């Protein structure tokens, strides 16, 4: 992974990284402060020495059962530089009291649906997101099912099935050959 990239980020933004470490596979991780997220993401995308233009994915982590006094949630970003053939993994820690961080959609359009997924399943809000609504669960769904404190046997309200528009065959076609 990219210790080189983390060094370049630290040089450009000395206060942005609160922590950096290498995991047991040799992968480099950087922990960003939430207020530094957007400037650092823009920098790693646009700086030719970094060139992390490929947004691979992002995810949420609920750390509820860990006892290390760190914030409950994390949002993890996975980026790749085709130029340098390097992966970059950045994460932002998010407090339970106000689970909210800036949106990355204006920097990486690919973050749009990933942020909706993290909102839908973990309840972490992304300020500045153009359309932050549920992506997989229906709108009436109560709670966020990947949180560790979500009750497994909770019953959800039943709603009538909604019609789905067939965008391939168009109106008035039966779909049979």
What spans do the regions from the language model cover?
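Terminal low-complexity/charged segments
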Residues: 1-177
């Amino acid at each position: 992974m990219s210790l080189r990239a983390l060094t370049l980020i630290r040089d450009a933004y000395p206060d942005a990284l609160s922590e950096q470490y290498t995991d047991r596979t040799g992968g480099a991780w950087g922990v960003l402060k939430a207020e530094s997220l957007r400037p650092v993401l823009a920098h790693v995308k646009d700086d030719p020495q970094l060139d992390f233009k490929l947004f691979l994915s992002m995810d949420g982590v609920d750390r509820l059962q860990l006892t290390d006094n760190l914030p409950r949630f994390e949002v993890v970003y996975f980026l790749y530089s085709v130029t340098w053939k390097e992966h970059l993994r950045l994460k932002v820690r998010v407090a339970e009291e106000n689970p909210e961080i800036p949106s990355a959609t204006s920097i990486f359009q690919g973050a749009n649906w990933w942020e909706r997924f993290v909102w839908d399943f973990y309840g972490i809000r992304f300020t500045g997101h153009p359309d932050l609504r549920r992506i997989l669960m229906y709108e009436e769904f109560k709670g966020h099912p990947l949180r560790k404190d979500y009750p497994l046997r909770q019953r959800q309200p039943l709603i009538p099935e909604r019609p789905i528009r067939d965008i391939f065959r168009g109106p008035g076609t039966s779909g049979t050959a």
